[in-house]
């Protein structure tokens, strides 16, 4: 009898642990998230969850800025509760999510005890594609004469982009004492999947811009003060820093040659390897959307400051 009495609780604990592990497992992996506030437009975020020693760990890429680690996560009554940490107001932000099946998430973002935006997520696609055998001849995305094929986005009423002297220029000079944020970005009207991009840029001292691949992955242009290498010239923003010892060389023309196939990107700057077929885990801050399986435009960041100049923008795509 004693053996049976001892065995029953042990068996119950084992069953509960197994169920909890199964409940957690369906939430693990990378998720492309869309956040829909009560007013305003939906915007993208991204999340990755892993499990280590029975503990859920992870990271989140918010709407802007760099990714950060979550402060905790647990599965409660079949729901995933992700603690994102406090917002500026001090309220704790949590995501409460369910997984109804088919690799999707639904839920709500809570600020303290108050329900906020609704959440929807899909499993991030693998995007595992082989390198194309042949590419098309490079063609210009900017003719140097006008903005045909490009359109401002964001704060379009404060568009500073002009075509001047064969260059695509964000004419938004830095004013001492002002952040000069709020000008428009600009994107191509055409969308692309896999490609080879050539682009040249001249970023002044103190300038800040970015080249967004498929509108989702930022190749950093300029500097954010040198404190974080992954925020400096040539970084895949917040994911991969430039090579050790790389110089920003602001105020000079520099070229980028970018090959993006699936989720893997190679970046050369002035012919020097910066990123060799590295995996892009997910969108960076400032992405237009989180629809990673879809083609997307190029977009150039203009909502910071500095007279950023681009030229000689060409693209090749896989031959069909």
Segment roles from a protein language model:
Residues 17-21:
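Sec/Tat signal peptide C-region and signal peptidase I cleavage site
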Residues 23-320:
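Carbohydrate-interacting regions of secretory-pathway proteins
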């Amino acid at each position: 009898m004693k053996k049976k009495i001892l065995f029953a609780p042990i068996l119950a604990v084992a069953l509960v642990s197994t169920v909890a592990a199964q409940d957690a497992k369906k939430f693990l992996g990378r998720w492309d998230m869309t956040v829909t506030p009560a007013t305003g437009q939906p915007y993208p975020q991204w999340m990755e969850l892993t499990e280590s020693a029975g503990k859920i760990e992870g990271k989140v890429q918010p709407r802007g800025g760099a990714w950060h680690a979550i402060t905790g996560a647990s599965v409660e009554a079949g729901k995933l509760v992700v603690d994102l940490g406090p917002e500026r107001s001090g309220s704790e932000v949590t995501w409460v999510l369910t997984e109804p099946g088919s690799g999707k998430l639904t839920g709500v973002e809570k600020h303290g005890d108050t329900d906020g935006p609704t959440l929807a997520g899909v499993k991030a696609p693998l995007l595992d594609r082989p390198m194309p055998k042949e590419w098309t001849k490079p063609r210009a995305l900017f003719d140097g004469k006008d903005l045909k094929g490009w359109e401002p986005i964001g704060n379009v009423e404060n568009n500073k982009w002009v075509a001047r002297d064969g260059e695509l220029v964000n004419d938004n000079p830095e004013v001492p004492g002002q952040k000069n944020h709020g000008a428009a970005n600009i994107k191509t009207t055409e969308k692309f999947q896999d490609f080879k991009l050539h682009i040249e840029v001249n970023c002044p001292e103190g300038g800040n811009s970015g080249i967004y691949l498929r509108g989702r992955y930022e190749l950093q242009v300029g500097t954010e003060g040198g404190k974080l290498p992954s925020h400096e010239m040539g970084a895949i923003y917040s994911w991969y820093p430039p090579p050790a010892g790389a110089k920003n060389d602001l105020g000079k023309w520099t070229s980028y040659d970018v090959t993006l196939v699936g989720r893997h990107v190679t970046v050369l700057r002035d012919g020097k390897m910066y990123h060799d077929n590295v995996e892009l885990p997910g969108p960076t801050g400032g992405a237009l959307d989180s629809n990673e399986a879809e083609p997307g435009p190029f977009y150039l960041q203009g909502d910071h400051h500095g007279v950023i100049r681009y030229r000689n923008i060409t693209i090749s795509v896989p031959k069909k």
